[in-house]
Structure formats: C-alpha cells, structure tokens
C-alpha cells in the first residue's frame, strides 16, 4: 500500500515531510542527473584538451537501462561528441553494474582497442575497468578514468595519483543536514524550501580536502553560503499557512 495518503494527511495537519526523490513532501531533494554526467564529462574534456592534445579514445560504461540515470550518459555523449579529436570506441552497458561487470566489459573492449585514453561511468564499473587495464598492462598515468558516486575506493585511487583522476559525488552529510535544518525551521514556524537540488561535486586532488572537511562537519559547510551553494540549490518556499502547496509530483529541476 502507498504511504502517500498517510503523508498527505500528516502534512495537512501541519507535519513536515522531507524526502529524497519520491513525493509527496514538504521539502523534496533530488539530484540533477544530466548535470551530474555533464560535470564528469566536462572534467574529462578539459583533461583531453590540456593533457592529451585534444585527442582521445573514450569508453563509456553506461547504465541506460535505468531510465532515472540515463540523462547522465546523454550528457557525456553531448560533451564528447562535440570534440572533433575524440573517438568513442565503446558505448556499452556492462551486464552487471559492479566491479566484475566493468572488468569483464573492459577485457572485451581491449580485444578490439588496446589503446584507451578515457573511461567514464559509475565508480564501481570504472574501478573494474581499471583492474582490467592493469592486468593487461594497458594502464598509463596519463589516462583519465572518472566515475560517479564518490566511492571510497575511487577516492583512494585518486589519492594515489594514477589513471583515476576524478569522481563526482553528492555530499550526503551536507544534504542530510539541509533536510534536518528544514525540519527544524518548520517546527519553529519558518518558511522552508519546497525543493532542493543536490549538486554534483567533482572530487579530485584539488578539491578532496574541502569535500572531506565538509563531509565531517556539514553544519559548518551549511552555515557558509558559498560552500552551501556548491552543494545545494534551493527552489521555492512553503510554510505552515501554505502547507497545502506541497510537492506532489516527481520533481526535477531538469524537467522541461
């Protein structure tokens, strides 16, 4: 049975509901998927231009079967196909979206293309691809492997300074704090945002220390407008008197 009628009744009585993705909610959080993919692809494009002379053989390890995540890969294609020196040698969804899937898929790709410069996808599959490159002796320090999710193993690879250059993460501590703050503000009778974008953050050697500091102390990050603005974007407002105007549809800032 759906929780929605119970949540709607609770909100009608003045209660606060904070949700990540599914409605209904007083304050709804979501992550813009196209922007998430674009953030990773833009980092790769800069690297290709600055370090690889504008030329690269690229592998996209996708997850297009999950409609929710498909915009990530649309964004990657949009960025990379606009670069004349880039060849997408493989654009494929591993059978399983995990390290084993990435490892198996990359081994297959290497049979036809043994010189790979860039690999993009979810962290778990890209970590598997890195393992395949290493076992085949085809890993190079100047490669750009990049993922999405901010996985600890990906961050450890980035800290080593090898092929893994960036992971795009969502700062869970900061967005969790934001949702808690909205609930606290509501209890004090204040207006709260109707919707919040959880913005993708590229985690690289240059940004890692700040990201980890904000993960450890989300209150300080939230209190600093510029740091908060790097992680969150607020939309609309709702208060007790307008509580019937809650979000009751699958909201995304990228819906047109």
Where are these regions (language model features)?
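Flexible loop/turn connectors
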Residues: 144-206
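Hinge/cleft segment of the Venus flytrap/periplasmic-binding protein
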Residues: 61, 68, 178-256
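Periplasmic-binding protein-like
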Residues: 1-8, 59-60, 90, 113-123, ...
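Hydrophobic alpha-helical
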Residues: 75-76, 95-157, 180
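Short, solvent-exposed amphipathic alpha-helices that sit
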Residues: 36-43, 67-87, 105, 128-132
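Hydrophobic alpha-helical segments within soluble ligand-binding/sensing domains
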Residues: 11, 27-55, 71, 102-103, ...
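Short beta-strand elements in bilobed, periplasmic/extracellular small-molecule ligand-binding domains
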Residues: 57-62, 77-99, 140
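Flexible loop/hinge segments that line or gate small-molecule binding clefts
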Residues: 1-35, 57, 151-160, 164
């Amino acid at each position: 049975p759906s929780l929605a009628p119970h949540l709607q009744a609770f909100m009608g009585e003045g209660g606060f509901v904070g949700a990540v993705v599914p409605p209904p909610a007083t304050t709804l959080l979501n992550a813009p998927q196209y922007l998430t993919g674009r953030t990773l692809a833009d980092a790769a494009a800069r690297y290709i231009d600055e370090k690889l002379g504008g030329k690269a053989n690229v592998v996209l390890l996708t997850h297009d079967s999950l409609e929710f995540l498909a915009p990530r890969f649309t964004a990657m294609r949009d960025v990379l196909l606009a670069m004349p020196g880039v060849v997408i040698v493989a654009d494929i969804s591993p059978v399983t979206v995990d390290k084993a899937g990435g490892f198996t898929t990359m081994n297959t790709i290497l049979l036809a293309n043994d010189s790979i410069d860039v690999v993009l996808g979810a962290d778990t599959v890209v970590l598997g691809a890195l393992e395949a490159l290493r076992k085949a002796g085809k890993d190079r320090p100047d490669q750009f492997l990049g993922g999405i999710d901010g996985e600890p193993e990906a961050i450890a690879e980035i800290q080593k300074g090898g092929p893994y250059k960036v992971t795009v993460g969502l700062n869970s501590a900061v967005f969790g704090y934001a949702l808690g703050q909205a609930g606290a503000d509501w209890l004090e009778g204040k207006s709260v945002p109707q919707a919040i974008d959880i913005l993708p953050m590229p985690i690289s050697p240059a940004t890692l220390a700040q990201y980890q500091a904000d993960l450890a102390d989300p209150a300080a990050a939230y209190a600093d407008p510029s740091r908060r603005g790097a992680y969150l974007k607020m939309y609309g407002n709702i208060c007790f008197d307008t509580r019937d105007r809650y979000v009751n549809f699958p909201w995304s800032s990228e819906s047109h």
